[in-house]
Amino acid sequence: MVAGRAGSERMGDIMRVRIHDVSLHVAVLAGCLLFGSRAGAAEPDWKAVEQALGKPGQVQAGDVFRVGMPRTDLSVNVKGVPVKAGFALGSYAAFRQVGDRAMVMGDLVLLDQEVPGVMSGLFSGGLEVTAVHNHLNEMSPHVMYMHYEGHGDAVQLARALRQALAASATPLGAPAAAATGGAPAIDAKQIEQALGRAGRDLGNGVFQVTVPRAEAITENGMPLLPAMGIATVLNFQALDGGRAAITGDFVLIDREVNPVARALRQHGIDVTAIHNHGLLDTPRLFYMHFWAVDSPATLGQGLKAALDQTNSQR
C-alpha cells in the first residue's frame, strides 16, 4: 500500500509539471500573439482622416484624435441670449485607434429639419445613433443634438460621417477667421477661484473647465476617455455688465443625479435635460445639462456645490 501511494504521488508530480509546462506555453503564445497584433497594427493616419472629413483635428490625451465642427453658420438665442458656437453649438468627432480598428463617437448639432437626413446618412455609412435630444430649452431656432458611434477603419468612418453631414449645413473645410474685438471679456480668475480648478480660454469670450470622472469608464471592455466626451464640461460665455451665461453637462452615475440637480437648483441654476448619450457604457452614465445667467463668481460657486456631489477627479 505504501509503494502504491508513492507511485501515485510520483505520477501526480509528473502530471503537475506537464500541466505547468502546457500553461506556460499557452501564456507565452498568447503574449506573442498580443504583441504581434499590436506590433502589426498600422499607426493611424490622422492626416487622411482630416482629408476624408474635411476638417482639421488635434491629438488629445489618451491618443484621442478629436475634430471640432462648430455650427458657426447658426445664430441661436437661448432665452434671448445670443450663444456662441464654441459655447453651446459644438459638433465633434472623437477617434481612437485600438489595434487594427478605430472607434469614433461624438455629437452633432442639428436644426430640426436636418435630423432625419443626417440620421439616415449615418445608418447608410454603417454608424449607429445612440441618442437624439435637446440640451437646452427656449432655443431659437430650435436645435437638437444627435450622438453617434462607429467602429472600423478610421478613414472610412470619417468619410461616412462627412456623407451624413452633407444632409446638414454644418460648415466643413478650413475654419473661418475668428472675429476680433466686440466680445466682452470674461473674468477667468473669478471662475477658477470659485471652482478651485483651472480652465482654458476658447476665445470669443468663452471659457471652459473640464472635469474628468475619477473611475474608469468602459464600453464592451474598451476605455472611454475624457477627450471622447466622457467628462463634465462647464462652459462660461461673457455677457455685458460683467455677467456670464453657463451651460454644459455633468457626467453622472445614477445615485448622483438627484443630489447634483438639487445643488444646482439651490443655486438658481436651471436643469434643462437629463439623459444618456451612449448605450453600453459601464458604469451607466447620465448627462445633466444646465443654464443660468449671473456673475461668474456666483455661477462658479453653484457649479462647485454640484461638483462636490460627484466622484470627479480632484
Please describe what each predicted stretch is.
Residues 2-14:
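Short, Lys/Arg-enriched N-terminal segments with co-localized hydrophobic residues
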Residues 13-27:
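Bacterial N-terminal signal peptides that target proteins for export
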Residues 37-41:
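Sec/Tat signal peptide C-region and signal peptidase I cleavage site
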Residues 42-142, 149-285, 289-314:
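Long, contiguous binding/interaction regions
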Residues 25-36:
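Bacterial N-terminal signal peptides
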